[in-house]
UniProtKB/Swiss-Prot annotation:
Encoding gene, per UniProt annotation: rpsI
Organism: Parabacteroides distasonis (strain ATCC 8503 / DSM 20701 / CIP 104284 / JCM 5825 / NCTC 11152)
Keyword Lyase: no
Protein name: Small ribosomal subunit protein uS9
Family: Belongs to the universal ribosomal protein uS9 family.
GO CC aspect terms: cytosolic small ribosomal subunit
Origin organism lineage: Bacteria, Pseudomonadati, Bacteroidota, Bacteroidia, Bacteroidales
Length: 128
């Protein structure tokens, strides 16, 4: 099997994933998963598609993460891994879609509007 790559985005985060046959090693920006995401919840989010398909020990995954915060980066990585696994085996798409791993979450920060302190907040109104 050659290297399969995919891209995932979430908020301001972009994840580029390279999946190859291996022993289940996940590397993010040249660091181990446990070093990059010390939080077990974020590690779990990244591993979710692999765990759902029971292929965690079959592939080595190299991830380049860019922008955003920890949560956005972990969810971008999850989407990219899901897309790469679908490229490898298209029959897995239904299982991953049922779990919601294939859908790109479009929610992002709403822009600040002129004449207001934030996107929706108004300056204090004085009646008199």
């Amino acid at each position: 099997m050659e290297v399969v790559n995919a891209i995932g985005r979430r908020k301001a985060a972009v994840a580029r994933v390279f999946v190859s046959e291996g022993t289940g090693k996940i590397t993010i920006n040249k660091r181990e998963l446990e070093k990059y995401f010390p939080s077990s919840i974020l590690q779990f989010i990244v591993k979710q598609p692999l765990a759902k398909l029971n292929v965690a020990e079959q592939y080595d995954i190299k991830i380049n993460l860019d922008g955003g915060g920890f949560k956005g980066q972990s969810e971008a990585a999850r989407l990219a891994i899901s897309r790469a696994l679908i490229k490898i085996n298209p029959e897995d798409k239904a299982v991953l879609r049922a779990e919601g791993f294939v859908t790109r979450d479009p929610r992002a920060v709403e822009r600040k509007k002129p004449g207001r302190p934030k996107a929706r907040k108004r300056f204090q109104f004085s009646k008199r």
